[in-house]
């Protein structure tokens, strides 16, 4: 996804939340070694959030759920004009797995991300589902399936477009 966004002059950084000690909770800093504050700073600095998750038993991972929970702290945060602090930023969902659930996961992610202020572009979700009960992972595929490549290109184009529009013309202040 980051490579596809780069085609639209969008640069980014990949953070694998599983590699960090992100404490459970709904505060900006849960203390005691919580690494969320550093991640939060990067999220706030970014115009685009790509939230990717595997499908586990038909649901998003507990780590993706934790990201949503930690973003809950932003509900009461506003900018100088009184807008939600994440309003004007764009979020997209990427879901991979060997079982059903991609549409439901995308819907859950979009609801949570929208609640904290993110906007989602047209066709803002990307997913790949392998065969149920098989062991082939997306990373094991010899090449990216054509439909996934097409959807990735569309998602990147629409995401970059919306982010540029919102940066140039923010949502009105209350």
Where are these regions (language model features)?
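N-terminal beta1-alpha1-beta2 submodule of the flavodoxin-like/Rossmannoid cofactor-binding fold
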Residues: 1-81, 139-174
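A short acidic, often aromatic-flanked loop/helix-cap motif at beta-alpha or helix-coil junctions
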Residues: 20-23, 128-135
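Short, glycine-/small-residue-rich phosphate/pyrophosphate-handling segment
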Residues: 80-131, 147-150
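Short, local alpha-helical segments
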Residues: 90-94, 136-142
């Amino acid at each position: 996804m980051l490579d596809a966004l780069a085609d639209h002059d969008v640069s980014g950084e990949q953070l694998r939340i599983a590699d960090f000690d992100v404490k459970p909770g709904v505060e900006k800093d849960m203390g005691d070694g919580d690494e969320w504050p550093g991640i939060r700073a990067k999220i706030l600095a970014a115009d685009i959030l790509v939230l990717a998750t595997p499908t586990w038993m038909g649901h998003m991972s507990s780590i993706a759920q934790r990201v949503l929970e930690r973003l809950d702290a932003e509900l009461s945060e506003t900018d100088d004009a009184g807008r939600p602090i994440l309003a004007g930023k764009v979020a997209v969902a990427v879901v991979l797995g060997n079982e059903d659930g991609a549409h439901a996961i995308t819907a859950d992610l979009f609801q949570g991300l929208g609640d904290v202020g993110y906007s989602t572009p047209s066709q803002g979700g990307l997913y790949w589902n392998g065969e149920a009960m098989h062991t082939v992972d997306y990373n094991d595929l010899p090449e990216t399936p054509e439909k996934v490549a097409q959807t990735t290109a569309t998602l990147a184009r629409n995401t970059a477009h919306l982010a540029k529009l919102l940066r140039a013309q923010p949502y009105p202040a209350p």
